[in-house]
Amino acid sequence: MKTETIDIIIPAHNCADTIGDTIKSLDLQLCKDFKATVVIDGADDKLEAVVEAAADSRPWLRCIKSSENKGAGAARNLGIMASVSEWLMFLDADDLLLPHAIATMQQAIPERPEFVIGKTMRESERGCYEVVGREQLTWLHGRMYNYSFLTAYSITFPNDLRMSEDLAFNMKCAELAKNVPETSWPVHIQRWNGKSLSRRSGASREQARTYIKACLDYAVNCVRAEREPEDLRLLPDALAACYYYLDAVERLFPNDHELYAEMCRDFIKLAQTVELPRLRTLPAWEARLARSLALPSRPYGTAYMPELTFEQRFINATLK
C-alpha cells in the first residue's frame, strides 16, 4: 500500500561536490513528511561515502546503488520501482528545493492531480535567476507526479536515452493528464552547471531540436486525435514550450539560420493547424495562445522577478 508521503528521487552520478547542498536543502523543508532516495548511477566511491554519511543522520534518506552507469532516466526508473509513496518528485543532484516546496506540493494532493507543475528559478551563468513555469512543460524540475497515474499508463523513462529522457516522460504525462494544477510561487532552484550534458553546445543544439519536435508532435497528435477541448488544457503550454525553445535556438545559435528556419516553419505550420474552429471552444483559448505567441525575447542573464529576496537569502544560507 502506497503512502501519501512524497518521495523525492535523486539520480546521482559524478556529483559528490554538489549533492551535499542538495540534501541540505531537504533538511530545511518546513514540512518533514517526505522521503528521499538517492540512486547512485555507476560505481563512485567518493559519492557513495558522501551519501551514506548523510543518510546515517537522516532517517528519511536512503541510497540505492547501480554498479553500471545507465543514465539519469534508468536511475529514476529504479527510484520509481523502489518507492513506497503515492507521490513522486525528481530532483537533480546539483539542484535545490526551496524550504516551502514540499508543503506547497502537499496542498495539491486533495485534488488528486495526475501531476503538479511547480515554478522553477533557473540560475544563469552570470548568477541571475529567471522564473519558469508552465511554458517549460518538458521539465521535470519542481514537478510532483502521482504514482498510480504513472503505473496505470506504464509511463517510465526510456532506458536507452541519455538525453531528453525527461522530455519523453513529460510529453506522455501531458498527453494523458487531465488535472494539472500549478503552484503560485517557485519551489525549485535549477543551479548553473557548465559541465552538464545539456550545457554543452553540441548537445544543446540537438536537445533544442529534439525538444521542439516533441512538443510539436504532442500538439499535432492532440489535434489529430480530435480530443475534446477540456482534454486540451496543456496544448497552449506546449506551444509556449515550442516558442521558448525557438527563442533559445535564436539566442544560443545566432548563426545557425538553417536550424532556426526549420524550427520556425514547423512551429508556424502547427500554429495554423491549431487555429481550427473546434478548438475555439476551449476556455480562454485565444488569449492563452496569444500569450504563447507573444512571449518576449528573454535577454540572457536577466533577473525577472523583484520578489527574489527571500529565495536569494535561502540560496546564500544553503551554500555557506
Located regions from the model:
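Membrane-interface aromatic/basic loop that binds lipid-linked glycans or pyrophosphate carriers
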Residues: 2, 248-320
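Glycine-rich, basic loop-to-helix element that forms the pyrophosphate-binding segment
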Residues: 66-83
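Conserved donor NDP-sugar-binding/catalytic core segment of glycosyltransferases
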Residues: 96, 100-129
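Catalytic core of nucleotide-sugar-dependent glycosyltransferases
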Residues: 186-193, 200-232, 245, 251-273
